From Swiss-Prot:
It comes from the Eukaryota. It is found in: Nucleus; Cytoplasm, Cytosol; Mitochondrion. Induction: By serum growth factors and during liver regeneration. CDD domains: NR_DBD_NGFI-B, NR_LBD_NGFI-B. Residues 524-547 are annotated as: Binds lipopolysaccharide. Binds 2 zinc ions. The lineage of its organism: Eukaryota, Metazoa, Chordata, Craniata, Vertebrata. Binds the NGFI-B response element (NBRE) as a monomer. Binds the Nur response element (NurRE), consisting of two inverse NBRE-related octanucleotide repeats separated by 6 base-pairs, as a dimer. Interacts (via N-terminus) with NLRP3 (via LRR repeat domain); the interaction is direct, requires binding of NR4A1/Nur77 to NBRE-containing dsDNA and lipopolysaccharide, and leads to non-canonical NLRP3 inflammasome activation. Interacts with GADD45GIP1. Interacts with STK11. Interacts with IFI27. Residues 363-598 form the NR LBD domain. GO terms for cellular component: chromatin; cytosol; fibrillar center; mitochondrion; nuclear membrane; nuclear speck; nucleus; transcription regulator complex. This is Nuclear receptor subfamily 4 group A member 1. Residues 267-342 bind DNA.
């Protein structure tokens, strides 16, 4: 089959004008080609033709491979022009070469015109130098002609990638400028090599003429533009006897920038395994498989072991072989563990929330926090203390109490009961008890809690008593209503402050006073479980605050205040009994009920 090579690209700048060149089509037929190129030394009116190929290769009956040669002129060197031809017959018909033709076979610097038995330099160029054959001057070594100086080729870039021509047009244009003009008409439009089909019966190759018409205009490919091969040039792909290039012209020829953008790098690929990835997960573009693997590993705090050298390949096919190396690569590419939601924050779309195995405040830390919050919410703040009734100078306490003093005593007790009830409801686990046990625990521990909380808030050194409502009274102001009981409360307050009890420890101690075993409980087991949890919380806190050698002694001294507290509770019941006997003011129903319920014990 005949094979014609045509290469397109940005030609180098010509040193002279080229607007007089003609653009006649070039006819290609299946036969031996002759070249109707005039010699620079012949007369302009009668251009002579070049010798036929049969003259050069007389006696050779094989096939001609693709060749690339340079034609030197007599006045200036010519660059190489790219052509190709093949012959299927060994006919000896050849065109007659005039005597004035100055071309000899020795003057051709052959780059790729060898019989079929020789290895073609074109194949070597394609395999060694890549795109240099198509996009830049041929750099492969070639046989040299004696006494012939090759033209110096200046490097220039080809804009059409693999279809860029060699830079042999420059010398060819300069050489053809000396040819006579074929016509006096206007210059032809910019065109590439054009090959016209035969108009008649197919003659022999010796009868078909080969005419070269370089483009007069410079065609450059702008950045970001892409061109496809024109449909008017079918079969003009660079070919080789050993290569199949029938589908080259079917695909568009794009610029270097567009080709590099199409091949895309790693965009759209998983950074871990290279699979398809649509978006970013945990800070890195990953596939759904690696996203789920990373999330499960972080949520479960999974630990993996590599059975190899901790350098296992992680790709789409082998990503499940070593979980250790896969997780390490997830971290190496930048996936962030802190972004993964924990179990408590996981979305539960489409599912009913499962019942927790234990209450959310089951841990000692959460329980201690809840106890501290309940204690702070039930007490008055320092900014809201009421000093409106506070008096340091009062009459001596000798004499009998009046109704006003008794009423004040009852009001302080009943007011404290409401605050203590609200505080107890905020203790984790208390409201889960049955209502009967809740009331029993409150009524049994009411006086103890009243004394303990009053002693902790008061300032015994200044003689100030701070009640739960924020009311501040002096010790002498409470002497007639409370009697000797108030002196014992202040003494207990001094001993409690001497221990240096902090708020967390006091919050746990107050809860233990309320949550304890009482006679008549309906569900004592649940009360005991809640008591053990609070005791463990207090023990852990004391161990943290006091240190290793001190926690046992500090805890025992703190719990040693509970018997003193029960003694003070008994004294308070006795005071209520005395005031009830005097019958100056009837006691409130809740106080009377508490008193009557404790008499039987």
């Amino acid at each position: 089959m005949p094979c014609i090579q045509a290469q397109y690209g940005t030609p180098a700048t010509s040193p002279g004008p080229r607007d007089h060149l003609t653009g006649d089509p070039l006819a290609l037929e299946f036969g031996k080609p002759t070249m109707d190129l005039a010699s620079p030394e012949t007369a302009p009116a009668a251009p002579a033709t070049l010798p036929s190929f049969s003259t050069f290769m007389d006696g050779y009956t094989g096939e001609f491979d693709t060749f690339l040669y340079q034609l030197p002129g007599t006045t200036q060197p010519c660059s190489s022009a790219c052509s190709s031809a093949s012959s299927t017959s060994s006919s000896s018909s050849s065109a007659t070469s005039p005597a004035s033709a100055s071309f000899k076979f020795e003057d051709f610097q052959v780059y790729g015109c060898y019989p079929g038995t020789l290895s073609g330099p074109l194949d070597e160029t394609l395999s060694s130098s890549g795109s240099e054959y198509y996009g830049s001057p041929c750099s492969a070594p070639s046989p040299s002609t004696p006494n012939f100086q090759p033209s110096q080729l200046s490097p220039w870039d080809g804009s059409f990638g693999h279809f860029s021509p060699s830079q042999t047009y420059e010398g060819l244009w300069a050489w053809t400028e000396q040819l006579p003009k074929a016509s006096s008409g206007p210059p032809p439009p910019p065109t590439f090599f054009s090959f016209s089909p035969p108009t008649g019966p197919s003659p022999s190759l010796a009868q078909s003429s080969l005419k070269l018409f370089p483009p007069p205009a410079t065609h450059q490919l702008g950045e970001g533009e892409s061109y496809s091969m024109p449909a008017a040039f079918p079969g003009l792909a660079p070919t080789s006897p050993n290569r199949d290039t029938s589908g080259i012209l079917d695909a568009p020829v794009t610029s270097t920038k567009s080709r590099s953008g199409a091949s895309g790098g790693s965009e759209g690929r998983c950074a871990v395994c290279g699979d398809n990835a649509s978006c970013q997960h945990y800070g890195v573009r990953t596939c759904e498989g690696c996203k789920g693997f990373f999330k499960r590993t972080v949520q479960k705090s999974a630990k993996y072991i590599c059975l190899a050298n901790k350098d296992c390949p992680v790709d789409k096919r082998r990503r499940n072989r070593c979980q250790f190396c896969r997780f390490q690569k997830c971290l190496a590419v930048g996936m962030v563990k802190e972004v993964v939601r924990t179990d408590s924050l996981k979305g539960r779309r489409g599912r009913l929330p499962s019942k927790p195995k234990q209450p959310p405040d089951a841990s000692p830390t959460n329980l201690l926090t809840s106890l501290i919050r309940a204690h702070l919410d039930s007490g008055p703040s320092t900014a809201k203390l009421d000093y409106s009734k506070f008096q340091e100078l009062v009459l001596p306490r000798f004499g009998k109490e009046d109704a006003g003093d008794v009423q004040q005593f009852y009001d302080l007790l009943s007011g404290s009961l409401d605050v203590i009830r609200k505080w107890a409801e905020k203790i984790p686990g208390f409201i889960e008890l049955c209502p009967g046990d809740q009331d029993l625990l409150l009524e049994s521990a009411f006086l103890e809690l009243f004394i303990l909380r009053l002693a902790y808030r008061s300032k015994p050194g200044e003689g100030k008593l701070i009640f739960c409502s924020g009311l501040v009274l002096h010790q002498l102001q409470c002497a007639r209503g409370f009697g000797d009981w108030i002196d014992n409360i202040l003494a207990f307050s001094r001993s409690l402050h001497s221990l240096g009890v902090d708020v967390p420890a006091f919050a746990c101690l107050s809860a233990l006073v309320l949550i304890t075993d009482r006679h008549g409980l309906q569900d004592p087991r649940r009360v005991e479980e809640l008591q053990n949890r609070i005791a463990s919380c207090l023990k852990e806190h004391m161990a943290t605050v006091a240190g290793d050698p001190q926690p046992a002694s500090c805890l025992s001294r703190l719990l040693g205040k509970l018997p003193e507290l029960r003694t003070l509770c008994t004294q308070g019941l006795q005071r209520i009994f005395c005031l009830k006997l005097e019958d100056l003011v009837p006691p409130p129903p809740i106080v009377d009920k508490i008193f009557m319920d404790t008499l039987s014990f």
